[in-house]
Amino acid sequence: MHSLRPTVPASTPPLDLLLTGADILTAEPGAPLIRAGAIGIAAGRIAFIGAEVPPGVTAARTLDLTGRLITPGYINIHLHSALTMVRGVAADLGFAPSYTRGIPNAMDLSAEEATSLARLGALEAMLSGSTLIGEHFVHADAALPALAELGLRVHTSLRLHDVDFAAVANGAWNYEAEIGFSLLEANLELYENWHGKEGGRVAIQFAAHAADTCSPAFLRRIAMEAKARGARVNTHLAQSKTEIKRVRQETGKTPVQVFDEAGLLDDHLLCGHCLYIDETDLPRFAASGAHVVHIPKCNAASGRMAPVHKLKDAGMNLTLATDTQHGDMIELLRWALATGRVQEGGVSDRWQPRDVFAMATINGAKALGLEHELGSLAPGKQADLVVLDCRRAHLTPATDPLGNLVHTAQGRDVEMVVVDGRIVVEDGHATLVDEQAIIADAQRVAQGLWKRARAQA
């Protein structure tokens, strides 16, 4: 555990930013809440954190944050930001847009349209406290510069598959090697051009879409390329009964078995949903070190819940993500807590606010191999943090700030977001981009997409 004692000597040069007066949840294992504490930031990192400011410390900018709560930035590890285009509609259709006729889907998007919508979704996520997003979708290469401009961390990939998605919504499942080859080549180019750029805020992953949309041969190729670069692989695993049925028909195996045989089932695999993990696969799944990406709101909206207690009891690392159509990780804390308790049929010590808070912070960092840099607030770590304004009726009294955060806070309570020591949200608004221009452009694009989709239905 990192020490939280202020140890900065008086001779230290001025800090870039000094935050005082706020309650602080560090997400460090076993660390207590710091009441009315202080955080010093210099050169993008946390210089000190504690109950008081060390003597002699000065800063280029000092902010009195009395009445606020500071937490680590939220690691939103699985996100398709462009799917803001089906907000308010797709959740009531029962299945993902790519599999559904009559609504806009990925294959309908131009690079410009995907960029506009992805920028909106990423903006929403950042305004709600996400400091890192795991973004994978079509035209990710075109959208990446616009997402990086927001100032948050972007771990991204093109959506990799060799099924012909243009035919999937009509019930045809055709695998074409050329589709997969073209997408993978584009993602390799994206990796070469962008991985590690923007001061390390950008990382390129390999997003193998799913076991039913990637042939076993294509999954093996993805595994080879990702392993050669030490890259993370983001996927949807056991997300639907249709997936389970199709994979069984095509291979005679389960999705977990298919990923294992392809060489993907290891500690670099980020597994979204995990709704239908076969009981016989659980020991193999847990032993692999793969990470579970829990997506409680989207799952519950379709009437389903992941077996999080079985996965946790098996020793798996559980992370959290918004997935599609909304980007509020604070709201998601509540969904994760509540749906987990519905599954248990009550309240127990094994599923408490501290558990879902860890999923949104340090567990996400662990899944990315970045737990020594991100996911908690400690001296030496990168300065990614969120400030919530708790001087509000629904956050009063602040008897237990963690309990309030999980049970009653909202993304709109976020007052400030700091990424790599830089303020990217202040007074609830983005500092580096024109919010209203992003919103207006996305509205324009979405209206055009819906008009086209309805004409084709």
Which ranges hold each PLM region?
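Active-site gating loops and adjacent loop-to-helix segments of metal-dependent hydrolytic enzymes
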Residues: 85-116, 158-180, 241-268, 291, ...
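Metal-coordinating catalytic core of metallo-dependent amide/deamination hydrolases
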Residues: 145-275
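Hydrophobic faces of well-ordered beta-strands that scaffold small-molecule active sites
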Residues: 73-77, 133-135, 154-156, 204-208, ...
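Alpha-helical scaffold segments that flank or form the walls of functional sites
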Residues: 87-152, 183-199, 442-445, 454
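Active-site microenvironment of metallo-dependent hydrolases
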Residues: 1-37, 42, 47, 361-457
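Active-site glycine- and acidic-residue-rich loops that bind
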Residues: 134-137, 205-221, 300-302, 367-369
